[in-house]
Design a protein with these regions (language model features):
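Ubiquitin-like/PB1-type beta-grasp interaction modules and other compact soluble beta-rich domains
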Residues: 1-84
């Protein structure tokens, strides 16, 4: 299971501040896309291009520009670019 915390408008869009994905291994971009698919909105307003991903080890990145594997047991935080500093 991969535990994902959704900050700002991402949590509002998804309808939950925390989501558990029943996957053993995923690419970080796939995590963002999976969360987008959970949103009832036609255009959730966050993508792999405008979302910071913070993984267990403290590395923050934009998944469209970096390849990063997320594994079972990892905690991930999705942060919108417009997060207020």
């Amino acid at each position: 299971m991969i535990r994902v915390k959704c900050l700002g408008h991402i949590g509002t869009s998804v309808g939950a501040r925390e989501v558990e994905l029943q996957e053993d291994i995923m690419d970080a971009a796939e995590v963002v896309e999976r969360l987008r698919s959970l949103s009832p909105e036609a255009d959730p307003g966050f993508t792999k291009y405008n979302t910071l991903v913070l993984v267990e080890d403290g590395e923050a990145f934009v998944p469209a520009g970096a390849k990063r594997t997320v594994r079972n047991g990892d905690n991930v935080v999705l942060i919108p670019f417009s997060h207020g500093g």
